Amino acid sequence: MKEETFYLVREDVLPDAMRKTLEVKKLLDRKKADSVADAVQKVDLSRSAFYKYRDAVFPFYTMVKEQIITLFFHLEDRSGALSQLLQAVADSGSNVLSIHQTIPLQGRANVTLSISTSAMEEDIHTLMNKLRKFDFVEKVEILGSGA
């Protein structure tokens, strides 16, 4: 298999189709669009252009392997919820560096996790999509990242 070569390119020199592909991916990751068709329509991009570039263009932060990412969760207060969340993070190969959980109010709690992604076996967006599938997770987002 041929080794992939990557280049760091400033956004303003990317073709419109690549920039819009990144916008579509962001809409889908953040659940701001219900489907690929909905997302491409919102940014005025053809579906064929999206599928052409979706596996070839990435935001820079997704390519940096050794970094710390802080995730924010809004969870239903359920027994074992945090344990399941932490297990999913561990299964991804991430290392939990810190955990902060608020006292549950009105059946909801906020959790902030800082994780090291240096040994992560999948990209952060795949992990976030897995975490969103838990029925007790109401919200998950990246608060920040750094090396």
From Swiss-Prot:
Which CDD domains does the UniProt record give? ACT_PheB-BS
User: What's the superkingdom here?
Assistant: Bacteria
Q: Which InterPro entries match?
A: ACT-like_dom_sf, ACT_dom, UPF0735_ACT_dom-cont
* TM region(s), chain numbering: none
Domain ACT per the UniProt entry, residue ranges: 70-145
PROSITE patterns xrefs? ACT
Return the Pfam families for the record. Answer: ACT (PF01842)
User: Cross-referenced SUPFAM superfamilies, in alphabetical order?
Assistant: ACT-like
Please give the family membership noted in the entry.
Answer: Belongs to the UPF0735 family.
Q: Which HAMAP family match?
A: UPF0735
| Record-given protein name | UPF0735 ACT domain-containing protein YszB
Q: Which organism is it from?
A: Bacillus subtilis (strain 168)
